[in-house]
């Protein structure tokens, strides 16, 4: 299988990239800059991961997404929501946090852009880094979303590009363990909503990664 991989530089996308390489050829890694606070760190992490695996990497800029949303991910006046570890498995708390960082149709936009590259490069798959934990609060991480996206792509691409997510049925701990087994370079990953010198260790993305690493026996700096 030939793939275009959506690579944000985070845990899920890094492990999904490694999975893609085991299952076939990765033609291109795509990273999106939509004005998010972590954009520079994500681009740096994604570029480092692509270089590690000796793959082509391209950044696509989508400034309009920042213009049309007030999400805390991009807003200069809104603080990123902090979380507590004990809240990570509480559906109501997770949904409230998700609403604060929601970007309109973000994954839909990403997948359709990647599908255009996939069709042009005669690739079979667009690979995304979804996971079971966040599917409950982010509907565009869910298996139903992938099914719907594939139904749409079967009409909008002549070669019937499909979306695949090798991590979608796994929780974060399982994803870390899978990455450890495949030798994923965790030191290159950026799993934070913020763009400071170091990960904040307070946002939901950080806390999920830290908890998973601890449970899986992965030491973080």
Curated annotation (Swiss-Prot):
Its EC number is 6.3.4.20. It is an enzyme of class 6 (ligase). InterPro entries: QueC, Rossmann-like_a/b/a_fold. Pathway: Purine metabolism; 7-cyano-7-deazaguanine biosynthesis. Catalyzes the ATP-dependent conversion of 7-carboxy-7-deazaguanine (CDG) to 7-cyano-7-deazaguanine (preQ(0)). Homodimer. This is 7-cyano-7-deazaguanine synthase. It comes from Pelotomaculum thermopropionicum (strain DSM 13744 / JCM 10971 / SI).
């Amino acid at each position: 299988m030939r793939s275009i991989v959506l690579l944000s530089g985070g845990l899920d996308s890094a492990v999904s990239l490694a999975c893609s390489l085991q299952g076939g050829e990765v033609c291109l890694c795509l990273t999106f800059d939509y004005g998010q606070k972590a954009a520079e760190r994500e681009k740096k992490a994604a570029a480092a991961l692509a270089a590690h695996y000796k793959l082509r990497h391209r950044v696509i800029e989508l400034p309009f997404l920042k213009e049309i949303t007030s999400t805390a991910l991009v807003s200069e006046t809104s603080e990123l929501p902090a979380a507590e570890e004990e809240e990570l498995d509480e559906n109501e708390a997770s949904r409230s946090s998700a609403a604060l960082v929601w970007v309109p149709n973000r994954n839909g936009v990403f997948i359709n852009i990647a599908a255009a590259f996939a069709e042009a490069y005669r690739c079979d798959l667009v690979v995304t880094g979804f996971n079971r934990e966040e599917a409950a609060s982010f509907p565009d991480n869910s298996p139903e979303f992938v099914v719907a996206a594939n139904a749409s792509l079967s009409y909008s691409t002549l070669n019937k590009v499909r979306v695949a997510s090798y991590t979608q049925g796994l929780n974060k701990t399982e994803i870390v363990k899978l990455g450890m087994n495949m030798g994923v370079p965790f030191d290159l990953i950026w799993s934070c909503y913020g763009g400071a010198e170091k990960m904040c260790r307070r946002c939901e993305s950080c806390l999920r990664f830290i908890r998973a690493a601890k449970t899986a026996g992965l030491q973080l700096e």
